[in-house]
C-alpha cells in the first residue's frame, strides 16, 4: 500500500502557488494549492472483497492537493474566492463517497 510521501514522477509537489490573474486585480496576492500527491491502484484485499456488495478485483486510492487553511476574499464587488494559506495531501473529493 502507498504511503503518504509518495509523489508522482514528473509532477510538482503539493504547494501554494500565486494565482496571477486574481493577484493583479489590486486586492493583494492570492494563492491557491497546486501539485500532485498520488493515485494508485492495487489488488483488493480478500477480507475487503468479502464485505463488498459488488466485489471488485482492483481498488483505487488517490490523494489530492487541497487547501488546509483558507479565507474568503471578495473581488469585483460580489465574487468570492478562497485565498489558500496552507496546503496538504488529502483524500480527493470524488473518492470520499
UniProtKB/Swiss-Prot annotation:
Shared alpha chain of heterodimeric glycoprotein hormones. These hormones bind specific receptors on target cells that in turn activate downstream signaling pathways. Involved in gametogenesis and steroidogenesis. One of its GO terms (cellular component) is extracellular space. It comes from Aquarana catesbeiana. Keywords: Disulfide bond, Glycoprotein, Hormone, Secreted. It comes from the Eukaryota. Disulfide bonds join 11-36, 14-65, 33-87, 37-89, 64-92. Pfam families: Hormone_6. Signal peptide: none annotated. Its main location: secreted. This is Glycoprotein hormones alpha chain. Belongs to the glycoprotein hormones subunit alpha family. It is found in: Secreted. Heterodimer. Glycoprotein hormones are heterodimers composed of a common alpha chain described here and a unique beta chain which confers their biological specificity to the different hormones. One of its GO terms (biological process) is G protein-coupled receptor signaling pathway. One of its GO terms (molecular function) is follicle-stimulating hormone activity.
